[in-house]
């Protein structure tokens, strides 16, 4: 099973409670503990200017899209061993779908 369109409103709540402490969404909001997510879709791992990534993130070499985010958000440390993202992941596929649907709308 892979990505399916989710509920952006539920994704917004997930972002607020699970992601917003470390990430921003809009252009120019800048990096926090984690990199700014503006322009996320179609971007390569480890490529946000001014953010200090681990070598693991820089060398992963994948492009963020629905499918890569769906897999990554289940267990970030398994998908990119050595990442400094201190997030255990979203185990429920529905939660990942909701969050990815929200991110696609809000990071353009």
Swiss-Prot record:
SUPFAM superfamilies: Cytochrome c (SSF46626). It is found in: Mitochondrion intermembrane space. GO terms for molecular function: electron transfer activity; heme binding; metal ion binding. Heme c binds at residues 19, 22-23, 85. Its main location: mitochondrion. The keyword Heme applies. Keywords: Electron transport, Heme, Iron, Metal-binding, Mitochondrion, Respiratory chain, Transport. One of its GO terms (cellular component) is mitochondrial intermembrane space. It comes from the Eukaryota. Binds 1 heme c group covalently per subunit. The keyword Iron applies. PANTHER family: CYTOCHROME C. Belongs to the cytochrome c family. Electron carrier protein. The oxidized form of the cytochrome c heme group can accept an electron from the heme group of the cytochrome c1 subunit of cytochrome reductase. Cytochrome c then transfers this electron to the cytochrome oxidase complex, the final protein carrier in the mitochondrial electron-transport chain. This is Cytochrome c. It comes from Cochliobolus lunatus.
